[in-house]
Design a protein with these regions (language model features):
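Hydrophobic/aromatic-rich, well-ordered segments within soluble, folded domains that form packed cores
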Residues: 1-25
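Short acidic/histidine-centered micro-motifs embedded in hydrophobic/aromatic stretches
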Residues: 7, 44, 91
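Mid-chain, well-packed structural core segment of small domains
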Residues: 30-79
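Charged phosphate-binding loop/patch that engages nucleotide di/tri-phosphates or the phosphate backbone
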Residues: 78-112
Length: 112
């Protein structure tokens, strides 16, 4: 989960979560710009939107559902010029971004 849908640093406590965490909004923008990482994230996010009749909990399980929401919140902020990640939040979380991720991002501005 961590290397497909990474979260902002400071949320997860496991070694894998810490290893794959994104340090800042600037790093999230760089992640999106990377030819492999950005493309993979977009492809996987799009695939979740193609699942019919399932909730995020059905797809990922309870813990990873929270990680997915957190990741989509981070990349919604980082990709202000595209709506893919917001569509995931809209579809699976009734438009409600992850408050813990938003708190970590508070005060960070996009460089793009």
């Amino acid at each position: 989960m961590w290397f497909i849908f990474p979260q902002i640093a400071g949320l997860g406590q496991s070694s894998m979560s810490i290893r794959f965490a994104v340090a800042s909004l600037d790093e999230a923008e760089a992640y999106l710009a990377h030819p492999v990482l950005g493309a993979r994230l977009r492809e996987c996010a799009q695939l979740t939107l193609e699942v019919e009749g399932k909730t995020a909990r059905d797809i990922f399980g309870g813990i990873d559902e929270m990680k997915f929401r957190s990741s989509m919140t981070l990349f919604t902020r980082a990709a202000s010029d595209e709506d893919l990640f917001q569509r995931c939040i809209d579809r699976y979380f009734a438009g409600a971004s992850d408050p813990a991720t938003l708190a970590k991002l508070q005060g960070q501005n996009s460089i793009s």
